[in-house]
Amino acid sequence: MKPKTIIEKIWENHVVYREEGKPDLLYIDLHLVHEVTSPQAFEGLRQNGRKVRRPDLTFATMDHNVPTVNRFVITDEVARNQIAALERNCREFGIPLADLHSEEQGIVHVIGPELGLTQPGKTIVCGDSHTSTHGAFGALAFGIGTSEVEHVLATQTLWQHKPKTLQIRINGQLGKGVTAKDVILAIIGRYGVGVGTGYIIEFTGEAIRRMSMEERMTICNMSIEAGARAGLISPDETTFAYLRGRKYAPKGEEFDQAVERWRALASDEGAEYDKTIEIDASTIAPMVTWGTNPSMSTSVDGTVPDPEQFESETERNAVRRALEYMGLKPGMSITEIPVQHVFIGSCTNSRISDLREAAKIVKGQKVAPGVRALVVPGSQQVKKQAEEEGLAQIFLDAGFEWRDAGCSACLGMNPDIIPEGEHCASTSNRNFEGRQGKGARTHLVSPAMAAAAAIYGRFVDVRQLEAEPVR
């Protein structure tokens, strides 16, 4: 029997209908819903007299528009209407909802895993591009548009062309101070935002196997920034240990049986991929983006590039535009770039391990004068745990703002906006023009790098912090 990748196994297990030359009809095991991309989908059901086919395979929360201070006072009319619509729609169609009063509320891609809804072998969709986060568990997870949200609500299926397979193998061990965020930024920086276009990526190799589940989620979260349809990692003992005891995970003997099924999902020895990229983990350093897409990055000990060093006129023009928008000059050291804002949060880096890493840097320090620093936990459960562990107090003592759960400053869709022309060290996933607010200048970094930037008011190499004072 021909060896198969995990991608092939999950896909074949979910094909409901196939016709040559056309997309496959896939069954969907879990549909995650939030307030921004769902109102029109529910209205479409209502207009056509349809019900939600599987409310038991659907789970909703509110995250994008939610204020992270005074969360019950929503001043923006659009946000208020979207949140009210989600409450009404979930009531009417019988969908479970983690609303603002729920201790389970949070960013949809944080609560899915922590509640045990996300499991190996599942097909998972959500009206949000970073649904690929759930691929860390060996699930096939991808974002969909609003018309597709309606289709899944009505039928529990989705038409999809089968993408090609790309293996990205990270060999060896990461150096001190280098994180999962640096790995995915390095991949995109070296190979571009189009490297995964037309592919589903499977991340493999020793460095991946050594990562915790939360680190793996960071990697898979940003597969989309590499252009991929989805990204995933074959499940292993780390996966199973994380899921054991979670609210919606199987229990007792059923869990043991599930583990046997999940174990069989891993890509077979000798399975063929359409393309493979190999990277030596030891060559990766802490990363910082300097431009306006995630591939415009360099190591923290690097410099802002000169547009003239790029081969094509298209690239040169893109770099010139990016530098003008970001207010940077060619040849500037990354450590010279001043930072006025720091955001530790988002579906990329707002889990408990992210907050622990940031708190290690912050403990006993103070936020630099002129810097505003936010820590926004990814869920109310993460918030509670961080408070119990004393992390929240570490941040507060240093001068950080400690918030409720939500998408917050990742996107300019709620009150947490970065002012025009100011630089933000952000643990989020996108640095496009205007992403964090009109004219905001976003630099993508790891939680440790963001924490260090808050303390020093500029980027510093976290690898040096223990060895010698940087100020």
UniProtKB/Swiss-Prot annotation:
Associated pathway: Amino-acid biosynthesis; L-leucine biosynthesis; L-leucine from 3-methyl-2-oxobutanoate: step 2/4
Keyword terms: 4Fe-4S, Amino-acid biosynthesis, Branched-chain amino acid biosynthesis, Iron, Iron-sulfur, Leucine biosynthesis, Lyase, Metal-binding
Entry keyword annotation includes Iron-sulfur: yes
Cofactor: [4Fe-4S] cluster
UniProt-listed Enzyme Commission number(s): 4.2.1.33
Entry's Gene Ontology BP terms: L-leucine biosynthetic process
Binding site for [4Fe-4S] cluster: C347, C407, C410
TM annotation in the entry: none
Entry keyword annotation includes Iron-sulfur: yes
Catalytic activity: (2R,3S)-3-isopropylmalate = (2S)-2-isopropylmalate
Family of this protein: Belongs to the aconitase/IPM isomerase family. LeuC type 1 subfamily.
Oligomeric form and interacting partners: Heterodimer of LeuC and LeuD.
Protein name: 3-isopropylmalate dehydratase large subunit
Organism: Geobacillus thermodenitrificans (strain NG80-2)
Origin organism lineage: Bacteria, Bacillati, Bacillota, Bacilli, Bacillales
